[in-house]
Amino acid sequence: MNILVVKTPEELAEAGYKLIEEVVKTKENPTLGMATGSSPLGIYAEMRKNKLDTSRVTTVNLDEYVNLPHEDKNSYHYFMQEQLFDHLPFKQTYVPNGMASDLEEECKRYESILAANPVDLQILGIGENGHIGFNEPGTPFNSPTNIVELTESTRQANLRFFEKEEDVPTHAITMGIGSIMKAKQVLLVAMGSKKAEAVKELLQGEYSEECPATVLQRHPNVTVIADQEALSLCSEAIADEHRQVFTISDLLSDSRVGETAN
């Protein structure tokens, strides 16, 4: 696992973009696993600013709310259109259909899409309780794409995007933890003290389904980009035989991070 320590949101965005750019430029027909929310916003802005050539890129999104129309500004369909799809020409884009009449069939359909488009790089944020995607504590590590009931803490965290609490969806479709772990490479980003406990568990906690992000301890190719606040609860002995620590200057000045992330 690589840990890239940044000082600002701008550094995080630049570092994340560099890793994505490398995958896009070196793979013939790459597939990117996309995340939503505030964590990847800067990275997507860098993709727009640099006019990244995404004409050969397929995207698969992590999740989508259930029963939230695609044109709703809080849907992840809308989010992706606004952030990327209206700005860059992708080969193909996929987002789970939370409006499907048969949600179980939609989950199976999405698993088929993932099987046909193996993810080269999966972007992840991390919830305050350690969730990845909408996979809450207690989710089996081998879970496929599934329908989940959102916990109260997750709904409260997302309340800022909605006018009132009753507007926040109660369910979502999410790629399962087993689905996420099939990605060839994972990029997880975390900023701020609110993520510190979850980041501590991810990096130095017990491998446990009670903290979904700890599954990444067993993934062979993970890069975590985090600021000092997000890393503030980690012990100083964060680097060991399983984890290498880098800075943004390492990423930009030599190839060590890129090589270990391939």
UniProtKB/Swiss-Prot annotation:
Checking SUPFAM superfamilies in the record gives: NagB/RpiA/CoA transferase-like (SSF100950)
List the EC numbers from the record.
3.5.99.6
Which keywords annotate this record?
Carbohydrate metabolism, Hydrolase
Pathway(s) where this gene product acts: Amino-sugar metabolism; N-acetylneuraminate degradation; D-fructose 6-phosphate from N-acetylneuraminate: step 5/5
Q: Which GO terms describe its molecular function?
A: glucosamine-6-phosphate deaminase activity; identical protein binding
Report the sequence similarity comment from the record: Belongs to the glucosamine/galactosamine-6-phosphate isomerase family. NagB subfamily.
- Which gene does this sequence derive from? nagB
User: Which catalytic reaction applies to this protein?
Assistant: alpha-D-glucosamine 6-phosphate + H2O = beta-D-fructose 6-phosphate + NH4(+)
Q: What is the enzyme's class at the highest EC level? A: hydrolase
Task: Tell me which species this is from.
Answer: Bacillus cereus (strain ATCC 14579 / DSM 31 / CCUG 7414 / JCM 2152 / NBRC 15305 / NCIMB 9373 / NCTC 2599 / NRRL B-3711)
* Function according to Swiss-Prot or TrEMBL: Catalyzes the reversible isomerization-deamination of glucosamine 6-phosphate (GlcN6P) to form fructose 6-phosphate (Fru6P) and ammonium ion.
- Cellular component per GO, a single term: cytoplasm
Gene Ontology terms: biological process: carbohydrate metabolic process; glucosamine catabolic process; N-acetylglucosamine catabolic process; N-acetylneuraminate catabolic process
Residues annotated as the enzyme's active site: 63 (proton acceptor), 129 (for ring-opening step), 131 (proton acceptor), 136 (for ring-opening step)
Q: What is this protein called?
A: Glucosamine-6-phosphate deaminase
Classification via InterPro entries: Glc/Gal-6P_isomerase, Glucosamine6P_isomerase, Glucosamine6P_isomerase_CS, NagB/RpiA_transferase-like
| Matches recorded under HAMAP family | GlcN6P_deamin
